[in-house]
Amino acid sequence: MNAVPAPSADVRAGIGWRDPHHEALLTRRPGLGFVEVHSENFFAAGGAARAVLRAGREAYDVSLHGVGLALGSAHGLDGHHLEQLARLVDDIEPVRVSDHAAFARGAAPGGGVWHASDLLPSPFTRESLDVMARHVQAVQERLRRPIAVENLSAYLRWRDHDMDEATFLNELARRTGCGLLVDINNLWVNALNDQRQGRLDDPDHAVRAWLDAIAPHAVAEIHLAGHTDTGDWVIDDHGSAVAAPVWALYRHAIGRCGSVPTLIEWDTDLPPLDTLLDEAARADAAMHSADGVPA
């Protein structure tokens, strides 16, 4: 087993670049590792949104996180979407670019393209892996850089798989040279829902086994977020503080991978900036403490 990389003081957690906090982030300049934006929100070449993002880029590293590449769609990539992303990448020069291991597009009955307007899970099959690898390679060639691909919070399951999710993502990274974006809250949400559907007994053990299986050298970024328990389902809604079990799983992850750029994802019911900074500081403490336990 490879030794865990030593903690690096240069690796720090980041938060989302969201409208209510732009002014304070530019004025206060807290010590963040990066800020994250949703790529598609900034595809328009001009206007105030892009201008404010450029100002943010002068103050912080920017991570572009997308939801629209549909890397697993057998119908193919949307060339227009990719070109818009490429222009944004050229303008902003982000520190990372990422999207999801998901599909969203297909051939519509009678012609045209059907779009789900959501992230749907790709089956973990050899055929699906071939499709996604081909698309990841095409995106990386156009952007002239590697991207990171995120594991999905999935509320439906395909009946048949050739492999498990960690094996699928490891092979995707091996074939394409892409990085992996490990969303620990997504893993926890999936495990809780699988437990409620009778597919597993111990969610914590399942997530730890997933993290143990993933290739540590491929992990380019980690996401932490909150979720909502509706009673029947657990929903990955990014609307609350990171839950205690997710923090424990994060400590397990960095115990294997070392210090990895980590995003505190909070997109709904946005709290005061200081709350986000406190969450980011907790992630920093976990990464840089000798035992990996947050202060």
Q: What are these model-derived regions, one by one?
A:
Residues 1-87, 295:
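N-terminal pre-domain/capping segments
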Residues 11-17, 33-37, 62-65, 95-99, ...:
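Hydrophobic faces of well-ordered beta-strands that scaffold small-molecule active sites
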Residues 18-20, 38-42, 67-70, 100-102, ...:
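Active-site beta-loop-alpha junctions enriched in small/polar residues
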Residues 24-30, 46-64, 80-95, 137-142, ...:
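Acidic (Asp/Glu)-rich catalytic clusters
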Residues 44-46, 76, 120-129, 190-257:
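Gly/Pro-rich active-site loop or hairpin
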Residues 78-180:
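Active-site acidic/histidine proton-transfer and metal-coordination neighborhood
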Residues 273-294:
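C-terminal helical cap(s) of enzyme catalytic domains, especially alpha/beta-barrels
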